[in-house]
Amino acid sequence: METLAISDKEQFQTRLAYVADIAAMMQRTLQFMAVHGACTRADAATLCLADDTAAWVCGRGAAPAFASFRVRIAGFQHPCRALAHFMFEESLAQRCSKPLPRYTYMNYAFFRGVLAIKLSVYVGDLHADGLPYFVDFARGRALVRTRAPLQFPLPPFERRVEEAVAQSAAK
């Protein structure tokens, strides 16, 4: 991972401020999870903007279809009651699957009619796949992956979500 040089810092800060409330809500969600043993505080600190949202904040993509976040939780227990408490949904295929390297959760309720929230929980490398842009909003910096992404086989629902993200990033 390398720090990404931002050519238009004012635009970066404006776009980062646009998603700040959503990011703060996600941080509180992970703090709740840490307090209740669903993750550690170190796990919660790995939360970052990712995928189409990070590309947009960095000025490298169109307006996102989702507010996309990633977090690494090494000891993630699936299914996650804490995420269900905060109205995060997962596909039936994911719910019924064996252990996966990544779990995708969607929340359509918090910002209904404005933006859906996508949270990808990684058991291993947080930066393994997807678009190469990541924004650490706690430090206000952007990172870019410099190596090729890994390819994980996805359940059908997750594949549709990822295709929607890819289409929005391409526009």
Swiss-Prot record:
InterPro entries: Nucleo_LEF-12. It comes from the Viruses. This is Uncharacterized 19.0 kDa protein. The lineage of its organism: Viruses, Viruses incertae sedis, Naldaviricetes, Lefavirales, Baculoviridae.
